[in-house]
From Swiss-Prot:
A Pfam short name: DUF790
The protein's assembly and partners: Primarily a monomer in solution, forms a heterodimer with XPB.
Species of provenance: Archaeoglobus fulgidus (strain ATCC 49558 / DSM 4304 / JCM 9628 / NBRC 100126 / VC-16)
Record text about domains: Has 4 structural domains; the N-terminus (residues 1-146, NTD) interacts with XPB and has one nuclease activity, the central domain (residues 168-260, CRD), the nuclease domain (residues 270-372, NUS) has the other nuclease activity, and the C-terminal domain (residues 400-468, CTD).
Cofactor (UniProt): a divalent metal cation
Any one GO BP annotation for this protein: DNA repair
Gene Ontology terms for molecular function: DNA binding; endonuclease activity
Class of this enzyme: hydrolase
The protein, known as: Endonuclease Bax1
DNA-binding keyword on record: yes
Region Central domain (CRD), residue ranges: 168-260
Region (C-terminal domain (CTD)): 400-468
């Protein structure tokens, strides 16, 4: 994206439209690239002096925008700026400033000589090193140029992303690449709504301007979605943008697709939470499917993260990214009214609200799997079960005469009987306690319920310890 001061748009009659670069700006883009080409081995400050010569009252935002895009491209891909100093500037400054404020040239020279002796160098080298890491002092050491056409297209993408940073909401339609787009929405943690309009699946994404906190973080994630939309064969974007306390509408479609690059936005995505969820649920005996297809219900649709198979029925689970109270409340209402078997989970520290929403499982550090299982059971028809030991999945709610032991519900008197037998036998190995549990139809998951835990002391060897 570009800094807000480089936002270059046209506003008229409640509409806003970015002033995209085109073939008329080819020569300007070429000149900016040429400055970087000829700037190898020179200071960044010198490059900027040359670039300012290209500026006038009409094009200064575009010139500076081209430079910013070129710099971003440099940092990511094609060039490098290095410090022109054999000393580390930060250490030099720390040592110089330890001597306090100097009031004369004589004092200044004395401090420089002292620091030079410390680093075994000359005062001139110390003076050069003092601010060698400032932006204007950095040296351009490598540059693989873009073509003017690519620079123009990358600039247009950055300008569009910057225009949309203050969006209240973004509504779009794409003809294809739906799975890529929806996966991006989820991985970026964006607040969204899917609905049908005239046979088309429309997507409405909440903009950063609606949030009271985390605006910058959400806005950057929001911007990263745009390239995924633009890669579709056909697309349409409509945005409501807040600008200087006024609301503007921006509408663009694939008729201007040639103004943008065909780039795939790299997403840094931490899948640890999803991997842990799948692993834990599988350990609890559930069959879990990751990233199932979009689930439609009436005119609405949802992008679940998981599908849990309960016999011949699927229950969907969605872990929300960023959220507000209103967003979660509306989503929960739609789930309820559509009768979709979907469980909504939200992380407290990603929220912009009081987190007081019914029918949403909230968590801070770890997902409360007990609540998830309880919610899953609401979707499973309860069987009439009898027996001393019953698998938990057969109960929607465990009767009071049973005690939960891992994946099992054990009749209370039988539970006490097993507990006494374990205490009398005083097990020391995993095999000792497993033998007792097996007699009653219980597995390893029940061990903790009886006051013991497993400690592995080697490959394939474990001992039993009391938990208290």
């Amino acid at each position: 994206m570009l800094p807000k001061e480089l936002l270059d748009v046209r506003r008229a009659k409640g509409r806003i439209f970015p002033k995209f670069a085109d073939e008329r700006d080819y020569e300007l883009a070429e000149k900016v690239i040429e400055i970087f080409k000829k700037g190898l081995g020179k200071k960044y400050g010198n490059l900027m002096k040359q670039a300012r010569k290209l500026e006038n009252a009409k094009n200064f935002k575009k010139v500076r925008g081209f430079i910013r895009v070129l710099e971003n491209h440099c940092i990511e891909k094609s060039c490098a700026f290095d410090v022109d100093s054999e000393l580390e500037p930060r250490k030099v400054r720390m040592l110089l400033f330890e001597h306090g404020f100097v009031t004369s040239k004589k004092e200044r020279d004395r401090v420089l000589e002292y620091v030079a002796r410390y680093f075994s160098t000359t005062p001139e080298t110390v003076e050069r090193a003092m601010y060698a890491d400032r932006e204007e002092e950095l040296i351009l050491t490598k540059f693989r140029p873009l073509t003017p056409d690519n620079l123009i297209k990358l600039y247009n993408l950055s300008l569009l992303q910057t225009t949309l940073f203050n969006a209240l909401r973004l509504t779009f339609w794409a003809s294809d690449r739906h799975k890529e787009i929806f996966r991006s929405i989820k991985r970026l943690g964006l607040m969204y709504e899917l609905y049908e309009d005239s046979g088309r699946l429309m997507v409405e994404v909440t903009g950063a301007a609606t949030l009271l906190k985390m605006t910058r973080k959400y806005g950057v994630s929001f911007a990263k979605l745009i390239p995924w939309i633009l890669r579709a064969k056909n697309w349409f974007i409509r945005a409501e943008i807040s600008d200087f306390d006024r609301l503007y509408i921006m509408e663009i479609d694939d008729r201007i697709r040639d103004l943008f690059p065909d780039v795939e936005e790299r997403l840094s995505y931490d899948s640890t939470l999803e991997e842990e969820f799948a692993r834990k649920m599988q350990m609890l005996g559930y069959e879990v499917e990751r990233e199932p297809d979009v689930v439609k219900a009436g005119k609405y649709a949802f992008i679940p993260d998981f599908a849990v198979n309960l016999g011949d029925k699927k229950v969907y689970i969605e872990i929300a990214g960023f959220w507000t109270d209103e967003y979660l409340r509306k989503k929960a209402e739609k789930i309820k009214s559509s009768s979709i078997p979907l469980i909504l989970i939200a992380r407290e520290d990603f929220g912009d609200g009081g987190a007081n929403v019914k029918d949403v499982i909230l968590f801070s550090r770890k997902i409360p799997y007990g609540e998830v299982i309880k919610a899953l059971k609401r979707y499973k028809p309860e069987k009439k079960v009898e027996g001393d030991v019953v698998e938990l999945e057969n109960f929607a709610e465990v009767p009071s005469e049973y005690v939960i032991a891992g994946k099992y519900a054990v009749r209370r008197e039988i539970f006490e009987e097993i507990k006494r037998e374990i205490e009398v036998s005083n097990p020391s190995t995993l095999e000792d306690i497993k033998a007792i549990l097996k007699k009653y139809g219980l597995g390893e998951s029940a061990i903790r319920a009886f006051g013991y835990r497993v400690r592995w002391i080697g490959l394939g060897e474990a001992v039993i310890e009391r938990t208290d």
